[in-house]
Curated annotation (Swiss-Prot):
Belongs to the frog skin active peptide (FSAP) family. Dermaseptin subfamily. The keyword Cell cycle does not apply. The keyword Signal applies. It comes from Phyllomedusa bicolor (Two-colored leaf frog). It is found in: Secreted. Expressed by the skin glands. This is Dermaseptin-B9. Residues 23-43, 76-77 form a propeptide.
Length: 77
């Protein structure tokens, strides 16, 4: 009976250890995924910032050209 008890305790102990290791690996994987998500978010933010900046410059130059072309006929009259 004592042998059975020791065997049962050994099996339970090994099961808990393996469960603990699996949970630790799972946490590490989740942390890595979060870091990848953060990096992707930063890249998207930088991309949008660049796109908006470029669009702003284009709109500004377009408005300047339109206003400039409207001002020229008035000065000729």
């Amino acid at each position: 009976m004592a042998f059975l008890k020791k065997s049962l305790f050994l099996v339970l102990f090994l099961g808990l250890v393996s469960l603990s290791v699996c949970e630790e690996e799972k946490r590490e994987n989740e942390d890595e995924e979060e870091q990848e998500d953060d990096e992707q978010s930063e890249e998207k933010r930088a991309l949008w910032k660049t796109i908006i900046k470029g669009a702003g410059k284009m709109i500004g130059s377009l408005a300047k050209n339109l206003l400039g072309s409207q001002a020229q006929p008035e000065s000729e009259q």
